[in-house]
Amino acid sequence: MAEVVKTSAIAPATTMSIPPIVVMAAKAGWRWQWQRLMGGLGPADAAGNYCRPKSDHLEAEVPNPLDLQSRQPDQRPHLIVGRSCPWAHRTWLVHQLRGLDQSLNLITAHADHKAGRWQLDPPWLGCSSLLALYQRCGAPPSHRATVPVLIDPSQPKILGNESAQLVEVLNRWPSHNDAPDLAPPDLQNSIHRWQELLQPNVNDGVYRCGFARNQAAYNRAVTALFAALDQVESSLKQSGPWLCGEQITLADVRLFPTLIRWEMVYAPLFGCSERPLWQFPKLWDWRRRLYGQPGVQTSCDAKAWRHDYFGALFPLNPGGIVPTGPDLTTRVASGISNE
């Protein structure tokens, strides 16, 4: 008769009639498969640290402002974003904060989990997928079709597909006279310093936590992540209300997509749960303040985030169950966490 294997103390009080050797073999097999599957999400170094793959980006361009002003609405450049992508969210935020809707059209691509690509519904320029659109624009066959991407439909041509460059381009994009400058010359050094801290430790840091291949790699990532958040909290306390002082800048734009997804995705799925955000009161107020800026709430879709992260990242959520979550606006506006 098979030996009865008792479940752990954290599971319901049940037993299962599975021989221990089968359980051990299943764990070993799953561990091996998990490592292979995680490799599909992103590479890791020999120590198990997640390393973001190099992007296939094209140098960004800004069309002639006079040319843009003379175009019909359907011939304006189009910014294509995905609701769940935090890198695309940066460009969307600049579009909203600077009121670029009169000179730049916005398209939202949808994640197709089965095909593993971005889909365009309805199709645009005769293309129903972002890959087909990249190919139509003459992108090298080896390039991944990623969001965000800025496309000029008159040729058609890709004007840029790297978020770090595109936020700079969109900050110089023709707009109405009172559109804010998110990177004024006197704050360039401060913006750059924040970028140097936040990109590896927070923006990539949450992925380094979630995609770590072992406990030591996770421990390193989560320590760096919360140390960086402590620095943000301290800076906001001393010289807020924004990261660079009295005005919102690209430094705020780059941080916001990560922190607005915190309770919905990164804490529960990526293990970024050492401390809840409400324990950073200045950072909590900062997030609430930015969320309340005109047009920002429109760019935030918690349901899409949960659906795409929990539904697509099979190695992190093999059951495929997409959890419900708190109302985003209620959570952001609250000073009390339910965690």
Which residue ranges define each predicted feature?
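C-terminal alpha-helical interaction module
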Residues: 1-339
